UniProtKB/Swiss-Prot annotation:
Amino acids binding chlorophyll b 4: Q18, R29
Protein name: Chlorophyll a-b binding protein of LHCII type 1
Native species: Euglena gracilis
PTM comment, free text: Photoregulated by reversible phosphorylation of its threonine residues.
Chain sites annotated for binding chlorophyll b 2: I6
The record's free-text note on cofactor binding: Binds at least 14 chlorophylls (8 Chl-a and 6 Chl-b) and carotenoids such as lutein and neoxanthin.
Pfam families, per database record: Chloroa_b-bind (PF00504)
Residues annotated for chlorophyll b 3 binding in this entry: S10, E26
High-level lineage: Eukaryota, Discoba, Euglenozoa, Euglenida, Spirocuta
SUPFAM superfamilies hit by this protein: Chlorophyll a-b binding protein
UniProt record similarity statement: Belongs to the light-harvesting chlorophyll a/b-binding (LHC) protein family.
Chain positions recorded as chlorophyll a 3 binding sites: L5, E70
Entry GO terms, CC: chloroplast thylakoid membrane; photosystem I; photosystem II
Localisation per UniProt entry: Plastid, Chloroplast thylakoid membrane
Length: 127
């Protein structure tokens, strides 16, 4: 199972590990709130402590705005990772190798030229 996780060969192993780890973390977080206090006021486990060295979450007025910003930045990061995964699947190389290949000749090695040259329609014989 560990080899499948390291080399990302088993999607089911990765999914099961993700569900177990996130379930444990969220269970711990939900279990550390007083009964009837879940979702009220500021959650003492999120965000803060060592993850908030500037004390940005101390103000209850800006806390909801910071939560929305965190969600949006997380979605943006996931979209970027999806691009990395798609690029790795198509080219068989990682993002650094693809970037270095692009830097060799940016006008010839880019997404548009790859799209035009690799997916050009081929002539079809009409019956």
């Amino acid at each position: 199972v560990v080899q499948a996780l390291i080399h990302a060969k088993s999607l089911l192993a990765i999914l099961a590990t993700q569900v177990l780890l996130m379930g444990a973390v969220e269970g711990y977080r939900a279990g550390n709130t007083a009964p009837g206090q879940f979702g009220e006021d500021l959650d003492r486990l999120y965000p803060g402590g060592p993850f908030d060295p500037l004390g940005l979450a101390d103000d209850p007025d800006t806390f909801p705005e910071l939560k929305v910003k965190e969600i949006k930045n997380g979605r943006l990061a996931m979209s970027g990772m999806l691009g990395f995964y798609a690029q790795a699947i198509v080219t068989g190389e990682g993002p650094v190798e693809n970037w270095l290949y692009h830097l060799q000749d940016p006008s010839a090695h880019n997404g548009l030229t790859a799209l035009v040259t690799q997916f050009a329609p081929t002539p079809v014989a009409l019956l």
